[in-house]
Structures are given as structure tokens and as C-alpha cells.
């Protein structure tokens, strides 16, 4: 190989690459599942569904101190371009059809992250409220839970790391068989009517006593 002159190095400081005959130096060999999982976990596009104070902590995770965009997470304004749904805050019965509709509009594969006690269990608003949904997993399947009231930004980053590990270990064939499909609510089927859990009997017994 002819050495380059000083003038050529100044104009083009990058020397041309040498092409070898070794296959490992020129071609990357990997499985299709590994390539697919690497692409998915490196480009998660979240869609935020925030209804309460937990969502404010999630906004802090996008600040310069944590910078969640370094994971390839670019927020999207429409569910049709997102593959990660993040719910934060209380989900009410009126919100349930809209939330399920947004989830159904997301393309496969899609993931759901429940953030905060109100989303996971209904929180303090579900104790005596017949309109609060006691857990978003009764409406849509959830992949990662972030407990807290509200959870800190460090917990959000830890959840993102766990979700990336889950995606990295997925298989295309296993996902079709293990994906949760049964839900209490869906677009073609109505919400199942169940007897109310809070009937006020404990209040009546307390007054009698």
C-alpha cells in the first residue's frame, strides 16, 4: 500500500480501510431474533398517558440529568407511531374505553408500563370510589410496573432498563404464544359488570354500634 503524502493526510485525514479475507472482519453473524430484539430495545418510542402527578416525575426523567433519549426513546404524539404505552395516574371508568382504544391502535410488538400506585392498584382514590379502575392491568396487559407515589426518576430509568432486558431475551415465536390476550375490556366486548365492592355496610354497622 502506497503511503499518503502530508498534503493528502491534511485534506483526507482518514486513511482507507484495508479489506481482508477474513469473514469475521467483514461480516457480522447473528441470529434474526438477536437483531430484531436489538433494534426494538434501541428504539422504543413511548406514548404517554398521564392523568395525575406521577406524570410530572416522568417529565423529570427526560431532563438533562437523566436524559432518557440516550436510550433511543423519542416521545410520539400518536399511538400509531409508538410501541410503548406509559400510563401514569388514576384510570377511571370513563377513561377506560379511550385507553383501550389507544392501546389497540399501537402496532405490534407493543409494551405497556404502569407508573405509580394509582395506575397499578387504583391508589387512595379507589377505596370509596366506584369510578376508579383498580389496576390498569384489568384493561390492558402490563409488562413493567413502577411502584411509588410518585416514583422517582431513578425508578423510571430502572424500569426502562428492565424492559430493555426483557425485550433482549424475547423470541419471535415465543412472543406469539406468551402474549397476554385476555382482558376485562376490549373494543368489541363491553366491561364485565360485577357487584360493587364498596356497599357501605361497614358504615352502617359502625353507626349502629
From Swiss-Prot:
InterPro entries recorded: NADH_UbQ_OxRdtase-like_20kDa, NADH_UQ_OxRdtase_20Kd_su
Key words of the record: 4Fe-4S, Iron, Iron-sulfur, Membrane, Metal-binding, NAD, NADP, Plasmid, Plastoquinone, Quinone, Thylakoid, Translocase, Transport
Cellular component, GO annotation: plasma membrane-derived thylakoid membrane; respiratory chain complex I
Binding-site positions, [4Fe-4S] cluster: 53-54, 118, 149
Pfam families linked to this entry: Oxidored_q6 (PF01058)
Enzyme class, UniProt record, top EC level: translocase
Cofactor dependency: [4Fe-4S] cluster
MF terms (GO), sorted A to Z: 4 iron, 4 sulfur cluster binding; iron ion binding; NADH dehydrogenase (ubiquinone) activity; quinone binding
Primary localisation category: membrane
Membrane disposition: Peripheral membrane protein
Location(s) in or outside the cell: Cellular thylakoid membrane
Cross-referenced PROSITE patterns: COMPLEX1_20K
Cofactor binding, per record: Binds 1 [4Fe-4S] cluster.
Chemical reaction(s) catalysed: a plastoquinone + NADH + (n+1) H(+)(in) = a plastoquinol + NAD(+) + n H(+)(out); a plastoquinone + NADPH + (n+1) H(+)(in) = a plastoquinol + NADP(+) + n H(+)(out)
Its EC number(s): 7.1.1.-
GO biological process: aerobic respiration; electron transport coupled proton transport; photosynthesis, light reaction
Subunit structure: NDH-1 can be composed of about 15 different subunits; different subcomplexes with different compositions have been identified which probably have different functions.
Stated role: NDH-1 shuttles electrons from an unknown electron donor, via FMN and iron-sulfur (Fe-S) centers, to quinones in the respiratory and/or the photosynthetic chain. The immediate electron acceptor for the enzyme in this species is believed to be plastoquinone. Couples the redox reaction to proton translocation, and thus conserves the redox energy in a proton gradient. Cyanobacterial NDH-1 also plays a role in inorganic carbon-concentration.
Family of the protein in this entry: Belongs to the complex I 20 kDa subunit family.
HAMAP family: NDH1_NuoB
Protein name: NAD(P)H-quinone oxidoreductase subunit K 2
Record organism: Acaryochloris marina (strain MBIC 11017)
Amino acid at each position: 500500500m502506497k503511503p499518503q503524502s502530508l498534503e493528502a493526510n491534511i485534506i483526507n485525514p482518514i486513511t482507507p480501510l484495508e479489506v481482508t479475507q477474513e469473514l469475521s472482519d467483514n461480516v457480522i453473524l447473528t441470529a434474526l431474533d438477536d437483531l430484531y430484539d436489538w433494534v426494538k430495545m434501541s428504539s422504543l418510542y413511548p406514548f404517554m398517558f398521564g392523568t395525575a402527578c406521577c406524570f410530572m416525575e416522568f417529565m423529570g426523567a427526560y431532563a438533562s440529568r437523566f436524559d432518557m433519549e440516550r436510550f433511543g426513546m423519542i416521545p410520539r404524539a400518536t399511538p400509531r407511531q409508538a410501541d410503548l404505552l406509559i400510563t401514569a395516574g388514576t384510570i377511571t371508568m370513563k377513561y377506560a374505553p379511550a385507553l383501550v382504544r389507544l392501546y389497540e391502535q399501537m402496532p405490534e410488538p407493543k409494551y405497556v408500563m404502569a407508573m405509580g400506585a394509582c395506575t397499578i392498584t387504583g391508589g387512595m382514590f379507589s377505596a370509596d370510589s366506584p369510578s376508579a379502575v383498580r389496576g390498569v392491568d384489568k384493561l390492558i396487559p402490563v409488562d413493567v410496573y413502577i411502584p411509588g407515589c410518585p416514583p422517582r426518576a431513578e425508578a423510571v430509568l430502572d424500569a426502562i432498563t428492565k424492559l430493555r432486558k426483557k425485550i433482549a431475551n424475547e423470541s419471535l415465536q415465543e412472543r406469539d404464544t406468551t402474549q397476554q390476550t385476555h382482558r376485562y375490556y376490549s373494543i368489541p366486548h363491553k366491561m364485565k359488570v360485577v357487584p360493587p365492592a364498596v356497599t357501605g355496610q361497614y358504615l352502617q354497622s359502625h353507626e349502629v354500634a
